[in-house]
């Protein structure tokens, strides 16, 4: 079949914006040269010539409830999961169809954990997770680093926190990636500077996960990239509200926090403090009529030295009863119902502390798996 015209980068970007993306960057596949085999998208689509990265703004208002300490559900839903698993895929579908109608193949990669052979938290290879289907190929599934993809597509830079910053939204962006055999004009690597090394991300991180002085340096497409050394597990612990109880209003005996996914802390340093700082310094192109945070107003903190009375009803249902949001009940649910059977999940019994190593050699954590 003959096609009337070739798609250009401008065509793709216009379509992406029309379908609902806030940002769109494009790179050529050669920019992935030097990537570890388990993270190299060229093994996913060897015929790909270009990759497309779509950016979706995190609504600033989705952070407001945690900022005020009064609503903790909006950020993990509207600012997190809904962007990664609902809106991002909904925009990719029509873009894939649009490009297919012009004769191009497109591989959509959604920003959600799947069966990656690389641990998405620590970045370590999962021994025994899967087998290569042919000699020389990586273990399935290949894990593409979306922030690196955004950098290679010229969309911004890494901040000290390792969170990706764009000139438009700063840290308030989530990404999806598409691989295509369309040969598109790549965007230049971003040469500007958004992060001014203020280290507000370090000072305000509840998990104390970001080093103040130690850094990591890597080379991407011939450019040296640097960010602060990150303790990934401290980040996980802090994000879930377990590091600084003065920033977590929920009681252990009444752990509705499990219904909030993984964002109790609300990205206090790497997103909220960073965003507020960049806005105050007029570093971002997308502006607001009112400031996000009054720098003179102290941030709320909980005095846990005071006794807190837990009602008998809470004890009966959540501690002594079968309430699903109890830690043990949630663990058992994930081990059996969510996977079909405990055996299928490689788990012999529900761990009492969320830290049992299963048959695949993975640490099983109901907050992550």
Language model features with spans:
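Long, compositionally biased charged/polar accessory segments in the mid-to-C-terminal portions
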Residues: 291, 310-362
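Non-catalytic, usually N-terminal nucleic-acid engagement modules in DNA/RNA processing proteins
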Residues: 1-93, 369
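Long, low-complexity, intrinsically disordered extramembrane tails
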Residues: 364-368
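Short alpha-helix boundary/capping motifs
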Residues: 44-45, 127, 302-303
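Catalytic cores of enzyme domains
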Residues: 35, 77, 81-294
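Eukaryote-specific, cytoplasm-facing alpha-helical/coiled-coil scaffolding segments in long proteins
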Residues: 296-304
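Short linear sequence motifs
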Residues: 12, 68, 308-311, 326
């Amino acid at each position: 079949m003959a096609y009337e015209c070739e798609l250009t980068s401008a065509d793709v970007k216009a379509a992406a914006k029309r379908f609902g993306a806030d940002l769109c960057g494009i790179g050529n596949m050669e920019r992935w040269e030097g990537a570890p085999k388990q993270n190299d998208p060229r093994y996913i689509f060897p015929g790909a010539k270009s990759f497309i990265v779509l950016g979706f703004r995190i609504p600033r208002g989705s952070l407001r409830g945690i900022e005020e300490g009064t609503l903790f559900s909006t950020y993990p839903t509207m600012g997190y999961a809904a962007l990664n698993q609902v809106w991002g895929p909904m925009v990719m579908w029509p873009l894939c169809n649009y490009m297919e109608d012009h004769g191009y193949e497109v591989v959509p990669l959604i920003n959600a954990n799947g069966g990656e052979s690389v641990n998405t938290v620590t970045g370590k290879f999962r021994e025994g997770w899967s087998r290569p289907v042919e000699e020389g190929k990586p273990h399935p599934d290949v894990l593409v680093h979306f922030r690196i993809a955004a950098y290679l597509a010229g969309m911004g830079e890494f901040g000290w926190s390792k969170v990706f910053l764009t000139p438009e939204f700063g840290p308030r962006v989530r990404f999806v990636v598409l691989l295509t055999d369309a040969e598109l004009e790549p965007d230049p690597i971003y040469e500007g500077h958004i992060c001014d090394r203020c280290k507000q991300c370090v000072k305000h991180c509840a998990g104390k996960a970001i080093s103040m002085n130690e850094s990591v340096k890597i080379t991407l497409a011939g450019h040296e990239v640097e960010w602060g050394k990150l303790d990934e597990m401290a980040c996980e612990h802090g994000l879930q509200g377990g590091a600084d109880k003065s920033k977590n209003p929920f009681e252990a005996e009444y752990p509705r926090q499990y219904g909030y996914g993984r964002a109790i802390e609300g990205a206090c340093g790497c997103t909220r403090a960073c965003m507020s700082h960049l806005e105050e310094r007029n570093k971002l192109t997308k502006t607001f009529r009112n400031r996000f945070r009054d720098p003179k107003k102290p941030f709320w903190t909980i005095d846990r030295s005071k006794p807190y009375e837990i009602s008998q009803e809470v004890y009966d249902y959540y501690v002594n009863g079968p309430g699903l949001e109890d830690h043990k009940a949630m663990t058992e649910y994930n081990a059996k119902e969510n996977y079909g059977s405990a055996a299928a999940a490689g788990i012999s019994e529900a761990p009492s502390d969320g830290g049992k190593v299963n048959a695949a050699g993975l640490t099983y954590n109901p907050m992550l798996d």
